[in-house]
């Protein structure tokens, strides 16, 4: 990996803006920006959930936009900035597109393919090698992801608690209905007195005079 520059940090902040957009629509907050000669060509953020497309990672979304705009699937003059270390799918797509440089923010210890789990960018047998920079604004990039998942866990916990409360209320209601049904089937049980109506009781049910 090579060192980052102030220009890299500026571009990564643009990618962070895209990551915030992903959060707003309920997606895992990962954002990407593609630059050519220092100018923004395309942007993208995670969209697998909203598009029902498992390949719609931020890098792929931005890559598709750039390729369409530039009318070329090869982008050798372009650099891509992404807030999370690329997975194997994205890493290979970026190399197939012949990107000059890839810069990422936070490492991904579960699926990262730029050094965390494996490093596809370092495989010498591949026919194209892309310059790689990692850890640019890693802390804010990671904080955004941690905040998102903390919020998601809290929401799921609240949903489970609400479901349990609803189940308890339903159980109590069912027990109450069962009790009324049991009384209704008891021949010796007195008939319920309608609310707001006077009812004359049978003579044999009256208390003897004192």
Task: Locate predicted features.
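Zinc-dependent deaminase
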Residues: 1-22, 92-210
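A short, polar/acidic, helix/strand-boundary loop motif
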Residues: 2, 48-49
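Immediate flanking context of iron-sulfur cluster ligation sites
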Residues: 72-84
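Short beta->alpha transition motifs characteristic of CBS
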Residues: 41-48
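A short, polar/charged loop-to-alpha-helix boundary motif
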Residues: 50-61
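Short beta-strand scaffold segments in enzyme catalytic cores
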Residues: 30-38
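Small-residue (primarily alanine) positions within well-ordered alpha-helices
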Residues: 15, 19-22, 32, 42, ...
């Amino acid at each position: 990996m090579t060192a980052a520059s102030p220009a890299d940090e500026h571009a990564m902040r643009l990618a962070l803006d895209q990551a915030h957009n992903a959060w707003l629509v309920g997606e895992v907050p990962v954002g990407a920006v593609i630059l050519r000669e220092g100018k923004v060509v395309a942007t993208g953020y995670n969209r697998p959930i909203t598009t029902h497309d498992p390949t719609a990672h931020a890098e792929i979304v931005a890559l598709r936009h750039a390729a369409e705009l530039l009318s070329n699937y090869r982008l050798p003059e372009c650099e891509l900035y992404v807030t999370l270390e690329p997975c194997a799918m994205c890493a290979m797509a970026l190399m197939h597109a012949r990107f000059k440089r890839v810069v990422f923010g936070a490492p991904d210890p579960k699926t990262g393919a730029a050094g965390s789990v494996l490093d596809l960018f370092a495989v010498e047998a591949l026919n194209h090698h892309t310059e790689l920079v990692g850890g640019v604004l890693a802390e804010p990039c990671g904080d955004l992801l941690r905040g998102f998942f903390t919020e998601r866990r809290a929401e799921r916990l609240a949903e489970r608690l609400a479901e349990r409360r609803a189940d308890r209320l339903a159980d109590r209601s069912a027990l109450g209905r069962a009790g009324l049904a049991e009384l209704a089937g008891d021949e010796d049980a007195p008939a319920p007195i309608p609310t707001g109506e006077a009812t004359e009781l049978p003579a044999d049910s009256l208390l003897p005079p004192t």
